[in-house]
Amino acid sequence: AGYPGTPSSEIVESLASVSKERNLYVEWSTNEKVAMEVAAAGSFANLRSLCVLKQNGVNVASDFFLHLAGSGTRGGMVILPCEDPGALSSVNEGDSRHFSRMLEIPLLEPGDFQEAKDMTKWGFELSETLKCPVLVRSVTRLSHASGTVTFGDLPTTEQQATFKHDGFVLDPETGPVISAPVNYKHGLQQQKVQQA
């Protein structure tokens, strides 16, 4: 799910163009907060999900983002903020790297489009291992670059959505999706960052 804005729009457009053949659900959301909520819902149902937004959108989604980092994820969830250093096509600059530090979640910063593909794949795997969202940060020059990317094998299995919510309250796999007490979650987040 995503919200349009340079330099992030092309990602959702590209995913939408292959959505039928790859069995992907892709949407333009009402705003960035809704996009993050839609992606989180997919993750809570044990599906991989991607939230695409520009730097201003991270601020729009920040209320939910703060809770999401505290409650954790189930299926791999990558949040892909596309930033515009120097405000080449935006009215201001933003830097989502501060959210990674504040929320104590992993941040990956690719330097070219092959790394962007590889790190996004790794971001999903890391998210599934750590049970938290992973930021994969892009910038204008990367978002608007083009070239050859080696995909490798694409997944062929069809994952089915499943949602459990009747387990132990602090069990991230079967319990309700809630933010646990801050002190408890803060310690867990620090362990996840060390593990990453």
Predicted segments, located by residue:
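Thiamine diphosphate
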Residues: A1-F113, D118-T120, V139-S143, P155-T156
